[in-house]
Amino acid sequence: MTNASNFKKILIISSYAPPSMSGASQNIYNLLRNLPKDSYSILTSFYNIDNISAKTSTWLKGKYIFYDKISASDLLRTQSEIIKERPSRLILNKLKYLVKRIWFLGALGGTFIMGSQIIMIIRAGIKTIKKEKIKIMIGFSDYGPAIISTYFLNKITKKPYYIFFFDIYKDNFYPVFPASILAKIFEPKILKNAEKIIVTNEGTLNFYAKEYGEKIRKKIIIIHNSTFSEHYLNLYNDYDPKSPYTILYTGSIYWPQIRSLKNLIKAIEEINDMDINLKIYCPNPKDYLKKIGITESKKVKILIAPPQKMPEIQTQADILFLPLSWHTKSQKIIDTATPGKLADYLISNRPILIHAPSSTFLAQYAKKNNFAYVADEENIEKLKSAIKTLLFDKTFTKQIIENAKSTFFKNHDANRNALLFQELFK
């Protein structure tokens, strides 16, 4: 049995910690799930935990400190408690609308919001480090506040820190001003002062090694996005697709996925010689999806389910769709990303269809390990052909399913990766 005394006391700093429903949040949960509850504390945002997540997703065992609502720290665990403390959604929506519509208000509001977050995290962090006898910190990437605050807490308290990048930082796309400016200023400082830098794939490692040289490369450790195989293994059944066929996408939908997902919808709408549909399970509001051009139709269904249901849903699909888009706001983020849901897909015992540019690490990783059909051209006819190959070429499909499971156990098994993560703090 793992004992808290075996570990340095850790302060987890994240804007979007579990139980928030996101790939990054789920990966944090997977890495920390088996750590003794007294070995770490979590400094995070109360207001980034939505009501659905609070009710249906899973909280970590460690102590929560909410930097934006200290009075709620380590007390709230139910939907009713979260809702009771929640500000008016109508007021928040009106403020967000004004900020988006008026650039000056957006710049002013964004500066105030980011500045306030950083100050709150630092203030709460100083108190927590002293009270909880923290020995080391780890900042998880967001749009800036968590990792910038980690850097400043190191300067103030002299406690060492690691940085965990789910995506590249400086060259990402941030809609909130002044996130991009701050990223350009602080990324070199954050990397220089970090004891270790954790990334989720070789593409990101190579990107930072090229950008900053050998000294930074030596600090970098790869811990792939992961999930627990036991959630899936008991759900397996033979892959034998029958009409009506179902393509499945699970996860949030933002600018990195939108164009590629629309290509799939177009391909499905044009397939008239068989009964096929797309099911999208995502937490995004339907009004947001409508605004970006993704709506329900006879062949497209938009649904929502808690993370605990995803293994059952994914293992019943005929094809699992994994998109990254062309002509986006940040090609560098597209080229270095590995979506968190990849780990789920690999162990699902179902074929994966990747629709992403050939320049992406995701496409190259899949081809190298032959675990998916990679449609790396933005061509609707070839995408339709890929769908039919996965449904009807059973020899090919069986091979990529087996290769996917092999890749999972090599790189994406949360039981293994959690141990790699734990070793960093002994």
Regions found by a protein language model. Give the residues of each.
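Conserved donor-binding/catalytic core segment of Leloir-type glycosyltransferases
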Residues: L11, Y239-I258, I265
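Nucleotide-sugar donor phosphate/pyrophosphate-binding loop at the beta->alpha transition
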Residues: T157-Y162, K170-K189, S229
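Nucleotide-activated donor-binding/catalytic signature segment of Leloir-type glycosyltransferases, i.e.
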Residues: C282, D287-I319
